Every structure is written in structure tokens, then in C-alpha cells.
Amino acid sequence: MKLGVICDGISRDLSHTVDVMDEFGLEYAELQFVGEKEVGDHDASEIREIDLLLRDRGKPVSCLSRHIFAGTTIANRPGDELHTKHMDALKRVIEMAHIVGSPLVRIMTPKKEQILF
């Protein structure tokens, strides 16, 4: 069995997280927040640092996860300001996934509206 962890569930300090992963035999890293930024908000040099740390420590990235579309509602439409903001974030996360070798990008579902009959 191969085990991994959502890294910021341990700490947003990725180096510390990798130490804990080694201690408990966790192989795969799912990234959501690293430092003070959500994936997709890191600049190119920060992404290189993240990638280098994980590769040097033998921790493949299993998934990048961002709260894309969380908070949108049925009132939001493709092309509106909020939808465009989320789509731009998704593009940045996909670019980061290519760099760190992540096979998956996980997004969230829109806000569920209560339906009353």
C-alpha cells in the first residue's frame, strides 16, 4: 500500500512536513497550501524550491488541490468576474502540476444552494 498526506494538514512548512512524512513512512505529497500561499499563487522561483525539496527527499506529488469554484453559486456564469478568477487560478495550478509532476489537480464543487419546495 502506498500512503500519502495532504501536506498542510501537518504544517505549511514543507520541510517540516517532509520530516514528519519520513518519520511515519508517508510517500506521496498532496499540496494545497505551502507557506502562506495556496497552490497556483506561488511564483516561479517558489515552485522550483517546492519541486526541488520534494524531489530531493523522494516525495512524489500525488495531487495539487485548490479551492477552485468553492464559493461560487448557481448565479455565477461562465465568463463573469468570479468564474474568470477561478478559471485563471485553475490554469496556474495546472501549470504548477506540470512542473512538479503531479498527475492530478483536484478542485472543489460550487456552493450547494438549499432547495425549498
PLM regions and their residue ranges:
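N-terminal pre-domain/capping segments
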Residues: 1-104
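Active-site groove signature of glycoside hydrolases
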Residues: 97-117
